[in-house]
Amino acid sequence: MEKITASVRLKKTRGERNRLLKEGKVPGVMYGKNIEPVAVAVNARELESLVERGLKLFELSVEGKTQRVLVKELQHHPVTGKLIHVDFQVVESGRKIRQLVPVELYGEPAGVKAGGILEHGLSEVTVECLPEDLPEFIEADVSKLEVGDCLRVKDLELPPGVRVIEDPESIIALISAPRDYVEEEEETTTSAPEATA
């Protein structure tokens, strides 16, 4: 399991936060069940590297003590997009966690080959599982979808030990008819001759 080191932050002022960001560190907080929240700072590059690779669960070493943590929330600067804050939740072995996981679509839908348009619904879902079973992402095969078909949460193939906490009917992806096809169909319906009595 990947590991990064954090230092404890004694000051929690805006000036201290700005100083850390200039030094290439990201301020954050580490918390968990029966644990007092601890203000920490981590190396921005190390954290970004883990996040870019989709790793949300790793070890965090604080003052020589290592905890298994989950990245619960990331805050980015609204203009620059740089990381400005992170929340780490300490997780315990044997205790289930809930976490947002991205859904990655793969395959070229049959409906798109026939001229349809692939529309995305949910791009991530909340899952519940043990920390060691947490997937980086959930794959969804859309290759068999025809025009008018949709893939719902209930259709996702999940890894063992993982359960989705979302409405099973929520749409992940759907194939809609091309706009000109819909307009053509409407014109045909409206211009049909009326039956005479």
Swiss-Prot record:
Belongs to the bacterial ribosomal protein bL25 family. CTC subfamily. Coiled coil: none annotated. The keyword Hydrolase does not apply. CDD domains: Ribosomal_L25_TL5_CTC. InterPro entries: Rbsml_bL25/Gln-tRNA_synth_N (IPR020056), Ribosomal_bL25/Gln-tRNA_synth (IPR011035), Ribosomal_bL25_b-dom (IPR020057), Ribosomal_bL25_C (IPR037121), Ribosomal_bL25_long (IPR001021), Ribosomal_L25_dom (IPR029751), Ribosomal_uL5_bac-type (IPR020930). It comes from Carboxydothermus hydrogenoformans (strain ATCC BAA-161 / DSM 6008 / Z-2901). Disulfide bonds: none annotated. One of its GO terms (biological process) is translation. This is Large ribosomal subunit protein bL25. Keywords: Ribonucleoprotein, Ribosomal protein, RNA-binding, rRNA-binding. The keyword Ribonucleoprotein applies. This is one of the proteins that binds to the 5S RNA in the ribosome where it forms part of the central protuberance. One of its GO terms (molecular function) is structural constituent of ribosome. Part of the 50S ribosomal subunit; part of the 5S rRNA/L5/L18/L25 subcomplex. Contacts the 5S rRNA. Binds to the 5S rRNA independently of L5 and L18. GO terms for cellular component: cytosolic large ribosomal subunit.
